[in-house]
């Protein structure tokens, strides 16, 4: 008897081949789908990274979209100068020129218009005079002692431009805006033949309980830390050092049972602010045991070790660390390229294709 296959056997073989082919295609498709979860304490730069993805991997912000940020730029500018003026009272700092006290009173009267998206010439003049005052500058230089937006100097130094009647925010202006993220913001884009879904989760503590169970099985976590937070306290808890809070959160994320097989990418962000700050504010404020120099390289390397040492699965889990400046598009582009290569490698490995 020959070994020819019956029609039934042939159909079974074809079916088997088709199942194998479908499984392979599903595996390749799964390898091309990337879910990224952005985590980190409040104001660590997560939302700025999301904005950069829109600029780098999509068409950026249209003129119409930029116009919609005008009120946010004005609101951030006003909030910043008001925060400084209020802190002067608390820190007992006087105006360099006593006439500025009248400007400060005017500021509170006129502030409402800017919150609505209008900057009158009168209000711009008041803010400019206040910002130039030596007492205001002295208070600004002590901003670690109160809560102040990182973008304060960026906007206040550029008041002539942003106060123009026909002002339209630039991409950089949009990147610098600060709006507290609540809930979950989802962004989609394609890069290197991968389909990315990026989830930005509200950083403040009250939001954290919304996270973990939803995100089992994400491809990678990008955990953002603001390097420049080492000498600051939390907005939600004036006793807690921000860097210590970040470390606590990183520990619980990195060693979480839901994320055993998830790649952890650590963005040590705001390196530009850290480089300036470390010259004046010693790292021992945060790490009393630190005995190194207050140079950028040595202090940054020490912080990196503090975070990487929290990983309890060193033998099986690698932390991929990058120093970033989330407002610098070229830097984020370069880093994200490297991150994507790691994701591709790990993804193919998981799908048995590498």
UniProtKB/Swiss-Prot annotation:
GO function term, MF aspect, one: G-protein beta/gamma-subunit complex binding
Residue ranges constituting the G-alpha domain according to the UniProt record: 32-354
Region feature (G1 motif): 35-48
Q: What class of enzyme is it?
A: hydrolase
Tell me the membrane topology, using the record's own terms.
Peripheral membrane protein; Lipid-anchor
State the residue spans of region: G2 motif.
Answer: 173-181
Q: Which CDD domains match?
A: G-alpha
* Pfam families named among the record's database cross-references: G-alpha
Q: What does this protein do?
A: Guanine nucleotide-binding proteins (G proteins) function as transducers downstream of G protein-coupled receptors (GPCRs) in numerous signaling cascades. The alpha chain contains the guanine nucleotide binding site and alternates between an active, GTP-bound state and an inactive, GDP-bound state. Signaling by an activated GPCR promotes GDP release and GTP binding. The alpha subunit has a low GTPase activity that converts bound GTP to GDP, thereby terminating the signal. Both GDP release and GTP hydrolysis are modulated by numerous regulatory proteins.
- UniProt protein name: Guanine nucleotide-binding protein G(i) subunit alpha-1
Name of the gene = GNAI1
